[in-house]
């Protein structure tokens, strides 16, 4: 399983969108493990050893060391140890399904750290090549102080065993329990009294011809039975869709939970093929939503022009400028004669609306959306500005202009006459678990707090600490 604790990523508060779901750098990997923070960097490991490393969660490069090779590792941090599980053999490699899942641990994932160094724990699960199971694709879940490991592939059952969280060894006498079929690359989650088993269906390892997709079932008991949304047992091949291919990226698999806290969750995975990167397998990070008790993939915000609507009041973010009327004879509305011709009125133009705007900084407020130019915002990723967990930084400008939304040092928000690329003009936009978004400036406030765009009442936006318990810091983006 792939679960990332909130505390480990507190500094990275994520943003969704980009013109593409692609991460920056060289995020080439197959079967990525849980993303882990260690010594200020972020690591994920893949099949055959090695993996990827990132300093900001957005730009990834080859790095990290994982001895042992093998298939589809997973990582979990318990106390001061990082436990790593990986499979040796199986998976149909060389025609067989005999396999061992091995465990090791280290106190750092950074090869330059004095705490780096793997210690072998031994085999924690195995299959003999004859039984109806294949011990590969391990995944961890730590819940209520107990450590569990799921594993298996299409060849037979998905199984779960219990490990000792203090040593990483298999609990004495513990026997595997069969919990699903027709999936592989499983992951486990626990939320609101439910256990969720996610697994990858479809075919893999053939680039753009791969049909991998991620599905889920749930149970009140960790050992099952797991059912999908239609009541079909996962032991009979059931599974509710979480995500399939999107755009020019095919075959999502190997789900990994990233719980950032504050109503924000994401997940890592790989796409079997990114058509814009030679069809290679790549790391990807998506928002995770929850609807009616079920997880589903969110959408990274795409570059475009939007109305930015406050979930608190329903009002739209806008420049605080004088209202310019659209020329209109009211008598034509109330007293038009029968049979009068019907014509389409033009939208107000930017030039008409802009004529009375101040030339320097302009404040922003909230108002009823009336399709005015000063209520429309163009959002685009900023090249070479870096990023954060899963996304680049964005600029937010009044559509058709270079007037940019900016944070001030005293926790207010204004628009600057032009976009300069300064940190106060760079923004993160995180999709939350309910589908709304949080908007956060890159720059720290004078108090060094992490602040977000928040609505005070119906008409005043400001920067303040985000409170997931209410709607004041939640926003939606709608195409005009």
Predicted regions and their residues:
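Residue-level detector of transmembrane insertion/anchoring sites
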Residues: 6-7, 71
